[in-house]
């Protein structure tokens, strides 16, 4: 797999072969992430999933392609078996293991995949503490391995649950919402500091669940190693109305200069 330090990278959050080909040709993306919801949104049928994964891996060559385990209710053995099948498809596949709050099953899966030298991307995390435990679980994994913070969903988690008096009453063991969990930017800063102070090169932090361009800027400014972005939002990074107007001014000036000939 291509040696990239992933200290400041963009991944494409998509399963569209067309979009992945387009953006990979620009040279700005260092990887691809996808999941079942993205595949459904992109119009894939069940029969198209594996062939599409193969195409994506070929397009990305040796850049990482994160593919998610398909059933969080499956047994440890079933999850490990599925992960091994994915790795047989292509060596640049990173297995996405969902954080599962109900028990320690995901930690067992992560450990077994590490023993098999299968790199992972621990996903669906909303708070600092989840990221810490996932980071410790994969600190000795093969590189590249990742942990993923869901930016917009983290905000939803705070607004809908963690700031609710009823939720706090029913889940006293979680404690009050702290400053580090008050915003995904704080979570990002906290996790990057945790990894640096611990001397951990693995994992790298991916920030996903990005809904708009402003969140991309916030995530990188907070220190995210990687931001994974949907094609439409990535395209919107190029936009500024003043840039459009400035280009029009320059074009008009050139046409005026040509008239002097």
What label would you give each PLM region?
Residues 2-21, 25-29, 34-112, 116, ...:
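Active-site beta->alpha loop and helix N-cap motifs at the rims of alpha/beta catalytic domains
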Residues 101-111, 119-233, 239-258:
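Catalytic alpha/beta core domains of metabolic enzymes, predominantly
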């Amino acid at each position: 797999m291509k040696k990239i330090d992933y200290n400041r990278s963009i991944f494409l959050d998509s399963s569209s072969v067309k979009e992945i080909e387009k953006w990979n040709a620009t040279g700005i993306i260092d990887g691809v992430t996808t999941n079942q919801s993205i595949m459904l949104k992109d119009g894939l049928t069940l029969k198209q999933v594996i062939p599409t994964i193969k195409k994506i891996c070929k397009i990305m060559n040796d850049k990482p392609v994160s593919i998610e385990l398909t059933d969080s209710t499956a047994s440890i053995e079933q999850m490990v078996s599925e992960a091994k099948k994915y790795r047989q498809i292509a060596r640049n596949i990173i297995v996405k293991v969902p954080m599962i709050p109900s028990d320690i099953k995901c930690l067992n899966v992560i450990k077994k995949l590490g023993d098999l030298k299968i790199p992972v991307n621990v996903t669906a995390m909303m708070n600092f503490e989840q990221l810490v435990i996932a980071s410790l679980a994969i600190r000795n994994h093969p590189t590249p391995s990742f942990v993923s913070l869901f930016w917009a969903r983290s905000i939803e988690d705070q607004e809908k649950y963690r700031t609710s008096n009823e939720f706090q009453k029913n889940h006293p063991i979680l404690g009050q919402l702290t400053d580090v969990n008050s915003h995904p930017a704080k979570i990002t800063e906290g996790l990057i500091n945790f990894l640096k102070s611990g001397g951990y090169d693995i994992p790298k932090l991916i920030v996903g669940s990005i809904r708009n361009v402003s969140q991309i800027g916030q995530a990188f400014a907070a220190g995210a190693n990687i931001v994974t972005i949907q094609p439409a939002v990535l395209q919107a990074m190029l936009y500024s109305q003043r840039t459009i107007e400035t280009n029009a001014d320059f074009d008009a000036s050139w046409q005026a200069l040509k008239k002097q000939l």
